[in-house]
Design a protein with these regions (language model features):
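Long, contiguous binding/interaction regions
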Residues: 2-203
């Protein structure tokens, strides 16, 4: 493949072509799913009386105490409601909210049984959408891996999501949708925005 242009631009294109781009959106997506599960299980609560119409179960635990963790969750929920774009700047902001939510310290083995049961049921139903169709990753492994707070260094070749940002609500909704009412599935979003259902290249 041949590219012409300024050296800096060519270098950026080659990085995109090889997947040598940090996928900030992927971390924001995974942490968003984790916060969605934490809220659905009542581990985190909003600091205001909020009803999240696309998925009432997310705020069914009701209003919680005013704490740094719940304040961060409430702010994250606002971005979910607004369908914030997962560009690099927004992803860094969402990661900061995830850190403030204290989820990093809430490892699986320390969660109450009822919380784990709720998270397991929700995760199992959407594992194929959230972790890949062929994934058999146990929810405890997935949860603790996110708590380790490791940012992926590379992504797939020609990952268009690093160029044309996707949306937080779309990614939480998953490829097949069904989580957030009134929000497009990732399949519909990808085909409309990128013209393909898998907006990445393959080696």
């Amino acid at each position: 493949m041949y590219f012409s242009g300024e050296p800096a631009q060519i270098a950026e294109i080659k990085r995109l072509a090889s997947g040598a781009v940090t996928p900030f959106y992927r971390r924001a997506t995974n942490e968003g799913i984790q916060l969605f599960l934490a809220g659905s299980a009542g581990l985190l609560q909003t600091t205001e009386d909020v009803q999240f119409e696309p998925c009432p179960g997310l705020t069914a635990a009701g209003r919680g105490v005013v704490s740094p963790e719940n304040i961060a969750f409430t702010r994250w929920l606002t971005h979910l409601q607004n369908g914030v774009l997962l560009d690099e700047q927004n992803c860094l902001m969402l990661h900061e909210l995830w850190l403030q939510s204290g989820t990093e310290q809430r490892r699986w083995e320390g969660l109450p049984d009822d919380v784990r049961d709720t998270i397991t049921a929700l995760f199992t139903a959407k594992r194929g959408d959230w972790c890949g169709f062929w994934s058999n990753e146990d929810v405890s492994v997935w949860w603790n891996r996110l708590c380790d707070n490791v940012l992926p260094e590379k992504t797939m070749p020609f990952d268009l999501l690093t160029v044309l940002p996707t949306r937080l609500d779309v990614e939480v909704n998953g490829f097949n949708g069904g989580v957030l009412n009134g929000v497009p599935s990732a399949y519909h979003w990808y085909t409309e925005q990128y013209g393909v259902k898998w907006p990445v290249g393959y080696e």
